Regions:
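ABC family nucleotide-binding domain
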Residues: 1-190, 197
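Conserved beta-strand-loop-alpha-helix hinge in the C-terminal portion
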Residues: 193, 201-226, 230
Length: 230
């Protein structure tokens, strides 16, 4: 089944890029392909001008850990682990020692405003706080590209805006690109660019703020791109 067609997109350091469009337009599929969670049947994804295909499973997994950070709608926190321990899981996968992981987890939770909730379990955190733990975990590998799928969907208006403010701050201060799939029109004020998809095609790309010319990720996808059997 063809999901995306004639998609050609660059992603730049320090920018907030929104992917918008109706349900079924290919937003989440594009996000997953950019983040190497799905492999395109046609076309290529390049990181710093180098194709990311032809990697074995272990190399691909390490590339995702080192270059990409993901914040999914389901935060997938371990309920029996504290906020700090949930972040330490990602750091352990990256090879950090227990001592380094503990210190780094504290630093990352401070970055997202949870420095006082290190020992809190997910059940004792609000939805917005759980999301911030997920963001801290996504930052474990100091990613060049942070990706989020509908990050405001489960939050009230106030916390949704706080989440977007945090994403924009991370983009600017950590010089990472932030790519967000969203249906929420309130998020558009935080964007540098907005890519509008319909029926698997980019129908409009709006630039709202200047951004650097050095691109972090390039994904020309043509001929038609399929979802890999999904």
């Amino acid at each position: 089944m063809t999901v995306l067609q004639d998609v050609d997109i660059d992603i730049y350091a320090s920018e907030v890029l929104l992917l918008i469009g109706p349900s079924g337009s290919g937003k989440t599929t594009l996000l997953h392909i950019l983040g190497r969670l799905l492999h395109p049947m046609h076309g290529v994804v390049e990181l710093h001008g180098k194709p990311t295909a032809f990697l074995d499973a272990d190399e691909l997994a390490m590339q995702r850990l080192k270059h990409f950070g993901f914040v999914f709608q389901a935060y997938n926190l371990f309920p029996v682990l504290t906020a700090a321990e949930n972040v330490m899981v990602a750091l352990d996968l990256l090879g950090a020692s227990k001592r380094v992981a503990k210190d780094r987890a504290r630093e990352l939770l401070e970055v997202v405003g949870l420095g006082d909730r290190l020992d809190a379990y997910p059940s004792h955190l609000s939805s917005g706080q759980r999301q911030r733990v997920a963001i801290a975990r996504a930052l474990a590998g100091d990613p060049e590209i942070l990706m989020a799928d509908e990050p405001t969907a489960a939050l009230d208006a106030e916390n949704g805006l706080k989440a977007m403010e945090l994403f924009r701050t991370l983009a600017r201060e950590r010089r990472c690109a932030v790519v967000i799939v969203t249906h929420d029109p309130r998020t558009q004020r935080f964007a540098d660019r907005i890519v509008h998809l319909e029926d698997g095609r980019i129908v409009e790309c709006s630039t709202l703020a200047p951004f650097p010319t050095a691109n972090a990720l390039h994904a020309p996808v043509s001929p038609p791109l399929s979802q890999g059997g999904m």
